[in-house]
Amino acid sequence: MSKFIKIINLKLFVVLFFLVIPNFNNAKEILIYADSISYDENSNIIARGNAKIFQENRIILSELIIFNKEEEEIILPTKFTFKDSDENYFEGENGYFAKNLEFAEFDNPKIKLNDGSRLIGKKIKRIGKIDIISKGVYSPCKSRIKIGNFICPTWQLEGEKILHDNENLFLYQKHSKMRVLNTPVFYIPYIVTPSPLRKERKSGFLTPSLALNFFDTKTSQSTSFPYYFNIAIDKELLFTPMINYGGGVDESQRFVFDYNQVISGGSFKTDLTFDSNFENEDNNKWLTDASLITKYNKNLNQNFRIQVDSALQTSKNYIQKTKPNDDLSYKNSLSTNLNLEGFNLRKVDDYFKVSLNFYQTNQENEDNKIIPIVLPNIKYFLGYKNHDGFVNSSTIEFYNIFREKSNLVHAKKQQKISHKYNFTKELIKFNSKISFDTIIYNQIFNTEDKLIYEDNYKTGAYFRLFPIISISTETPFILNKYLKKFTINPKLSLVGSSGSSNSNRLSNEDSTNNDFTLENIYELNRYSGNDKMDNSKRITYGISAYKDNLKTTFSQTYEFTKNSNFHKEQGNDDNLSDIIGEIEYSRNNILTYNFRYDVYHSYLKKQNINFSTDNNIGKINISYLDQNSKVNNIVTKDIETVNYSLISKSFNKFSKIKFNGLYDLKKEINKEYGIGYSYFDECFGINLDFNRKSYEEDNLKPQDILTLMFSFKNIGSYKSTNLAVSENDKQDISWESYTLDNDEFTNK
């Protein structure tokens, strides 16, 4: 037995000697192992039984390997497995490899890429980093579906020729056909997609999209050809031209530029969209409409940061038409804001900000002439100073605001210089926390053409000294005897001010009518901003009680001032304010109840119930709102609505359903609702969503939106939206392509 082993070792040594010694200058030598190694009459090396060839971190496994020394080829007549240096696995038969393993050709290839994607075909030819597969099929799906007697992946791409570029990481397919559930869904003569092995961005065309638009008996088409530019490691541009044609409509083009850049200490992003119809006859105007959205953020140094946020459009509603899902579509006005912020300039906690603000209306019923321009707004917070427990701070502010036309609220032009001084002292006495707070405003206004009534305008300079002082106390204690570990915290606050009512000669530029809530009831100035002052003398009292998962809070105010502006604007007719309260219970579920109760008229002016849970069914949210028009001077109608939503847990492993809606109990209609289904496995996703929006105007019909989207791993998403009101109204059926993060797909 030992003699047999010695012979085997001798043969192995001879093989290694003849393979390595003649070419020792070549760094990529191969090693051959097998149960049996022999030579044929042509001095070819024949390895049988568990044969292996190693070259650096590449390996070939087979039951029979023949090495042709003269041609320097590795012949593989039977089934074999090859692992390359990138951990990709190849299976095949009846083929050969060059000695350096860079060139190969074999039948029935089966390739498993290192991300789990698969490629199979009839024949493969490997030239360096290029794999050319004849009659190939590509799919990233691991799961299989049985349809009749056929077992197939969820989806796959079939190509007459598939070329996989392992170096530039592109997948080229000729005469490509996609099958979903073994059903052909589309054909394209030539398609280029990023390789599933891609880890870095590359420039190139993305999947084009085709849209069919049906208008009565006419049909028009639009096509887009997105191209991605990988400009640099920190810069990218997506250019998408869209062409509309046919159906008797004007030929037009839309061009979208989406540019992103990472800069030192920040980022820059801009989206440019413009429409053109330069193909029309007798047309001398190539640009019809456009929008430009820009975001720029940069830390200039350790103390300063600059931010630019801009949205511009050439006509009203253009962004609403081109970007209906963007938050900008729902704003009354677009803005261009330039902010320069400074930190830790003189003190560690000071803060400096300069803002330039320009606005543009975004709604048909808005007048651009009353939209303000802020040039500039400057604020400087000097930081806190603490002297023996006395904490004080100061804020200096200046603004210059102007517009074309004034109204009852806003002047044509106004400048303000304001100094705010804040003083606070806290004491712990008698088991209570006692706080003393003082705010003193010194302000100078220069106002031009402020409309008082009808054609009566006022212009002038005004000085205002407005102090507000308060003393407050709270005394928490625990009830151990009756309610074990129940904490009770009563609170009392006395606030006094000059009592001077806000003048209608001043333009209100930065104050808004805040709701009367638990969040601001103890504030000294309950208005946001300081153009309007809370001219109130009042006492505020409340009590909080909490234990573990239960918390309750109740508060009320008594006004000593008859002409308290904030008190009146919040719908309070007498000295006693409404009672406001909140009850919250949170454990596995969260239930909150907020209310505002009018004590004089004995009715709930506002109540809101919120319930949310995350259980075995899914995430459920239900919100009920009942609000009277007297809550403030902005709300003009009574409101009673129910808002609801459900996002289910996954069922059947990959499926989810969702629905949501807003039901108007006053009008007994669903103002909006939607229902959707989604399926996402490890390689394929589908979304089907239906949404309806109703309008208060009788002449406006409900808007129905049905959206179908397919998502394919490593390929992207294709979305179709159908807006349909009736058979005779316009219907848009459009397929759009989207990039998709592969993290959306489940790896269960």
Q: Can you say where each PLM-predicted feature lies in the sequence?
A:
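Long, intrinsically disordered low-complexity regions enriched in Ser/Pro/Thr
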Residues: N337, Y359-T361
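A structural signal for short, well-ordered beta-strand segments and their strand-loop junctions
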Residues: Y172, L238-T240, K269-D271, K353, ...
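Long, charged, glycine-rich C-terminal linkers/tails
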Residues: P208-S209, N357-Y359
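Outer-membrane beta-barrel translocator/pore domains, especially the C-terminal barrels
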Residues: K125, I132-K135, L163, P189-Y190, ...
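Classical Sec-dependent N-terminal signal peptides that target proteins to the secretory pathway
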Residues: S2-A27, I65
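Short secondary-structure boundary/capping segments
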Residues: K3, T322-L328, R505-D510, Q570
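Sec-dependent signal peptide cleavage junction
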Residues: N25-D40, N728, S737-F745
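Structural signature for solvent-exposed beta-strand/loop edge elements and short helix-capping sites
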Residues: K28-T336, E454-D455, N632-V635, N652, ...
